């Protein structure tokens, strides 16, 4: 429990190193006598520090406190106005500052010129192209690095080398930043014109990226990669990441497979010792040489050399270095372009009349047929979701922007807001709500735009469409997704599968007479040529469907959907360019519609089918699998002869020709052994993921607090680490210290301790041990958890005022009335709460809640309030179970081969012992009978929390609940009277507990929890029929064993003799578990 607190204390002495600085630790204890001593200790410390006396004697006098109580926080104050960063930085600024090449990029503003050269006046200035968009500053980042360097200056042996490498790289950053002075941020962590005008425009975001990279350097290779990227990304702000990662699509095709995992009929991964040779035509090597030459032209030296050295024998053993380069390339930061350039990019493609109409026709027909196939059943059976599509849309309406700011009245309060949910309420109140009319998006009402920034790609634009588009599309798209869920071609949506299943799918059919074709179609999705055939295919499908039913409501739903497609065929967008707003006719498909993902998948499937049907005219093969996954599609083709170099080359060229005939600018490749798509790549029969999540730069600003962002930072660090990109953990912890500290006054700051940040309360930010989610069961842990629960939900006056207004109340009751047949308090309250929660995205509300949260937190961190709660958390349950378990040593042999080479050793070891999991454990209750019954008759989707509450009610109440949602009384009676109901009780409890224990997140999602190897380490005598208790005992045992193995690299076995008398008590408790939402769980969810 010590490391974080130790570093924290050292960090504070490092930052506040002057005479006037004082650190006062604050302790607490669940033992009331010790707690009294904690309070005395604190007040004496304050007294002495006010008099400027030493605290040493107090520490001695209160040894019982410092040794037995738990550290709650550290109060630090310093009267120095501290410009310590600049002072310390000078010591490291020994190198030559970098000079930017001012012609490195095509677009002038992407060159790293002085800000005043790009923006001559403050009025013209915008930080949107370089905003790190994170609630921490460059000076904090510099401090964190210098703190690490100072702590490790005396390291020895291998550690000293790491120190030397990082010191060397930091000299580059320090010298460059020092030359211009450290840019000071404002209260919102933004960099203003006054600060930036005499400094290079991209200085901050470059320095952040460089710090992130240098703190991820361990080996000599890391050092070479980082050095090259740091130096070059100072000048090249546009194409560097793309250049460095472009070889990967070819490299995956060069490694022989010697043993791999394949998906079997049971959808499990099983080892296959097949050998498949990589057959590579010369043309491929020529293409690779060209890529490497381009890299060298851009000034890269070491990275292309590493790739060339690897090419000598293309071994899978050395491939992780290639994977590393591929991951590192993303850490140069986001490419942020001006909106105008982002939009024009898609319109620049030349339109040619010389296209294969026959292929386009086939493409359109395939889209049409797929749309029909997806919706046919629902339409023929007059599905209630299609009948009540408007209500379904309203219930799942988001609180995102509606594209324009409006003045809205809620009771006596007038506010300005752009949020969809508020616009809907306002329109309803003023009789302006007309869901039957889809507003045009033509030249008279052009679409406002959002943006999506990604490292290594151009900025993409996003349509911000009026909410009517969402309502019109929601229900239909949901039906499409349900179809996609049980169609294997749609890798992204396929039922509860994860990426490992898709991996086994590809390797399964690879052999010496098969080749795999993989295409990145992201260009095609957003190209003009796609828009007409794409929308027309959908429209034709909808026309066919409309003739399959006589239900007016269903026909109306389809009609409105069709109208959205017609409107979007003539779309204009508005782009601010300086002070003018340009209107541009935009003839391509952009994200922003509800259908974006589903429709793109349909189109990409149609595209690859069209291409394959052409290829089939020339070659004889069997298509073993076709998959689409986001912007990528791939297919495995099996020939009746062995594949030769010539064949690979011919097929490859024919495929490219075929795409060219549709004027589709796509990157199509053919290989015999591996593929590379955006989400994952397969090489040498093993699976890799790109570890490219930026830590110190964010894509955009949201309304999350510093605490939320600290949790996201940690979560990103964990995901990167699982994927093979490791950042120094001490550095991450230092960032967490900085980001979770709370300023009380200018000179007074409060730093929470590890206990506060790692206990699963509403304030949890990280785990004290990577990959292990601990649920504290000691008295002090439960005590602090209770204390935090007492102040968890904060009120907001603005939100209350809005919620009390007639506008809001009428909206909520309109939804309830449309949804419910009879009164149902649970659902009505649920809707009201959901709608109220949506108000959080309105900035004044979230600010108000944040202030309340912080002031409550300040009180709590100085003295935790005892709080007797009747709420039970998962910790209480585990606290009750723990004493009955007896541990003994055990032994599990390694029995599975590695298939994910980038995993950290301790995680890899567990998978090799107990096996991996290719499915998501159901944690939302959607598979339960009650959930299915509700969705059969109603558009309402209860959350797992609600199902958990409902299923534990009396049978009479459950029946009323069901009937009120429109379920026929006979069905409700049958349900409550049947066995299914008692199975459901168990099933929903199981889902709920899985949900609470984050079993589908972090590294737990990789482990096979039902592994027989794991089961045999657990002995629990079976007593009586309480499956829920048996379940929780087993699950607890599994987590204990796995956590122990992650930590120690060895196995234990557990024996539990749980008294029968306690079982029923535990069972009752299990129906009152409260779920805790924290920045930590939100960050996990955000990863999803």
Swiss-Prot record:
Keywords: Magnesium, Nucleotide-binding, Nucleotidyltransferase, RNA-binding, RNA-directed RNA polymerase, Transferase, Viral RNA replication, Virion. GO terms for cellular component: virion component. Its EC number is 2.7.7.48. It comes from the Viruses. It catalyses: RNA(n) + a ribonucleoside 5'-triphosphate = RNA(n+1) + diphosphate. Residues 501-687 form the RdRp catalytic domain. Its cofactor is Mg(2+). It is found in: Virion. It is an enzyme of class 2 (transferase). One of its GO terms (biological process) is viral genome replication. GO terms for molecular function: nucleotide binding; RNA binding; RNA-directed RNA polymerase activity. RNA-directed RNA polymerase that is involved in both transcription and genome replication. Together with VP3 capping enzyme, forms an enzyme complex positioned near the channels situated at each of the five-fold vertices of the core. Following infection, the outermost layer of the virus is lost, leaving a double-layered particle (DLP) made up of the core and VP6 shell. VP1 then catalyzes the transcription of fully conservative plus-strand genomic RNAs that are extruded through the DLP's channels into the cytoplasm where they function as mRNAs for translation of viral proteins. Interacts with VP3 (Potential). Interacts with VP2; this interaction activates VP1. Interacts with NSP5; this interaction is probably necessary for the formation of functional virus factories. Interacts with NSP2; this interaction is weak. Belongs to the reoviridae RNA-directed RNA polymerase family. This is RNA-directed RNA polymerase.
């Amino acid at each position: 429990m010590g490391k974080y607190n130790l570093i924290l204390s050292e960090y504070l002495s490092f930052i506040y190193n002057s005479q006037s600085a004082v650190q006062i630790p604050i302790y607490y204890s669940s033992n009331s006598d010790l707690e009294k001593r904690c309070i005395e200790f604190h007040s004496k410390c304050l007294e002495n520090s006010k008099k400027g006396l030493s605290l040493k004697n107090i520490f001695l006098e209160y040894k019982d406190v410092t040794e037995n109580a738990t550290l709650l926080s550290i109060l630090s104050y310093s009267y120095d106005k501290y410009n310590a960063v600049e002072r310390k930085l000078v010591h490291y600024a020994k190198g030559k500052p970098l000079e930017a090449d001012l012609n490195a990029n095509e677009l002038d503003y992407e060159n790293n010129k002085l800000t005043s050269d790009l923006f001559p006046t403050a009025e013209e200035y915008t930080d949107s192209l370089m905003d790190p968009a994170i609630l921490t500053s460059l000076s904090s980042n510099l401090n964190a690095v210098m703190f690490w360097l100072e702590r490790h200056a005396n390291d020895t042996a291998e550690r000293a080398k790491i120190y030397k490498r990082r010191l060397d790289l930091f000299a580059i950053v320090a010298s460059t930043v020092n030359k211009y002075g450290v840019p000071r941020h404002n209260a919102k962590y933004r960099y203003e014109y006054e600060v930036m005008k005499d400094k290079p425009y991209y200085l901050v975001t470059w320095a952040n990226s460089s710090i992130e990279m240098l703190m991820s350097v361990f080996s000599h290779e890391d050092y070479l990669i980082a050095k090259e990227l740091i130096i070059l990304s100072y000048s090249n702000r546009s194409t560097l990441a793309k250049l460095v990662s472009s070889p990967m699509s070819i490299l995956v095709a060069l490694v022989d497979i010697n043993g791999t995992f394949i998906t079997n009929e049971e959808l499990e991964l099983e080892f296959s010792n097949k050998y498949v040779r990589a057959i590579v035509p010369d043309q491929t090597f020529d293409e690779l040489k060209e890529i490497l030459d381009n890299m060298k032209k851009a000034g890269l030296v070491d990275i292309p050399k590493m790739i060339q050295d690897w090419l000598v024998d293309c071994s899978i053993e050395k491939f992780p270095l290639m994977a590393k380069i591929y991951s590192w390339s993303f850490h140069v930061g986001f490419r942020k372009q001006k909106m105008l350039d982002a939009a024009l990019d898609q319109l620049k493609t030349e339109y040619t009349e010389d296209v294969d109409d026959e292929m386009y026709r086939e493409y359109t027909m395939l889209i049409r047929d797929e749309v029909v196939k997806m919706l046919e059943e629902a339409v023929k059976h007059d599905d209630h979701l299609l009948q009540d599509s408007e209500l379904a849309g309203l219930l799942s309406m988001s609180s995102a922007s509606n594209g324009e700011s409006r003045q809205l009245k809620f009771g006596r309060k007038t506010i300005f807001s752009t949020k969809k949910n508020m616009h809907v309420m306002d329109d309803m109140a003023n009789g302006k709500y007309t869901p039957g009319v889809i507003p045009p998006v033509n030249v008279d009402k052009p679409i406002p735009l959002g943006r999506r920034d990604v490292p290594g790609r151009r900025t993409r634009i996003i349509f911000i469409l009026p909410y009517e588009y969402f309502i019109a599309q929601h229900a239909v798209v949901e039906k499409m997704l349900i179809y996609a869920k049980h169609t294997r071609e749609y890798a992204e949506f396929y039922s509860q599968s994860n990426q490992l299943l898709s991996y086994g799918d590809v390797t399964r059919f690879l052999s010496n007479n098969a080749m795999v074709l993989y295409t990145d179609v992201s260009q095609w999705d957003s190209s003009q040529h796609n828009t007409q055939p794409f929308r027309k295919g959908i429209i034709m499908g909808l026309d066919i469907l409309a003739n399959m039913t006589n239900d007016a409501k269903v026909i109306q739903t389809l009609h409105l959907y069709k109208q959205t497609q017609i409107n979007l065929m003539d779309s204009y967008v508005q782009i601010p360019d300086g002070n003018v707003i340009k209107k541009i006719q935009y003839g391509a498909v952009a994200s922003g519609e509800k259908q974006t993902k589903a429709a793109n998948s349909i189109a990409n499937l149609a595209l690859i089918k069209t291409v394959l049907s052409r290829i089939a005219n020339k070659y004889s093969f069997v298509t073993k699998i076709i998959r689409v996954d986001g912007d990528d599609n791939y297919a495995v083709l099996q020939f009746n002869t062995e594949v030769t170099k010539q064949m690979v080359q011919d097929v490859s060229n024919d495929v490219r020709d075929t795409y060219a005939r549709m004027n589709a600018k796509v990157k199509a490749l053919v290989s015999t052994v591996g593929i590379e798509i955006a989400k994952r790549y397969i090489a040498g029969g093993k699976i890799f993921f790109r570890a490219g999540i930026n830590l110190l730069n964010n894509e955009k600003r949201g309304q999350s607090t510093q605490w939320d962002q600290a949790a996201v930072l940690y979560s990103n660090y964990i995901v990167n680490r699982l994927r093979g990109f490791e950042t120094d953990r001490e550095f991450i912890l230092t960032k967490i210290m900085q980001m979770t500290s709370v300023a009380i006054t200018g000179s007074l700051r409060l730093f929470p301790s590890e206990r506060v940040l790692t206990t699963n309360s509403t304030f949890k930010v990280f785990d004290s041990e990577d990959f292990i989610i601990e649920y504290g069961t000691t008295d002090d842990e439960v005590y602090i958890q209770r204390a935090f629960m007492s102040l968890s939900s904060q009120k907001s006056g603005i939100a209350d005022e809005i919620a009390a207004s007639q506008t809001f109340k009428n909206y909520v009751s309109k939804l309830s009335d449309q949804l419910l047949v009879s009164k149902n308090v649970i659902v009505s309250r649920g809707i009201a709460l959901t709608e109220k929660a949506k108000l959080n995205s309105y900035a004044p509300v979230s600010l108000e809640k944040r202030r309340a949260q912080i002031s409550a937190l300040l009180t709590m961190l100085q003295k935790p309030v005892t709080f007797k709660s009747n709420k039970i958390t998962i910790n209480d349950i585990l606290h009750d179970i723990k004493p009955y378990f007896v541990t003994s040593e055990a032994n599990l042999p390694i029995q599975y081969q590695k298939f994910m080479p980038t995993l950290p050793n301790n995680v890899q070891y567990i998978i090799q012992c107990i096996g991996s999991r290719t499915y998501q454990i159901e944690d939302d209750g959607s598979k339960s009978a009650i959930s299915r019954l509700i969705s059969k008759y109603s558009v309402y989707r209860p959350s797992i929390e609600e199902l958990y509450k409902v299923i534990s009610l009396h049978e009479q109440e459950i029946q009323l609940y069901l009937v009120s949602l429109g379920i026929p009384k006979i069905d409700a009676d049958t349900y409550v009277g049947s066995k299914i109901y008692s199975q459901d009780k168990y099933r929903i409890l199981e889902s709920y507990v899985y949900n609470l224990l984050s079993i589908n997140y972090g590294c737990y999602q990789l482990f096979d929890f039902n592994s027989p190897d794991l089961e045999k380490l657990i002995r629990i005598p079976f007593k009586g029929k309480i499956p829920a208790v048996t379940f929780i005992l087993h699950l607890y045992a599994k987590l204990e064993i796995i956590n122990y193995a992650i930590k120690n690299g060895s196995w234990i076995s557990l024996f539990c003799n749980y008294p029968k008398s306690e079982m029923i008590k535990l069972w009752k408790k299990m129906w009152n578990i409260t779920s805790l939402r924290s920045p930590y769980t939100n960050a996990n969810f955000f990863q999803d």
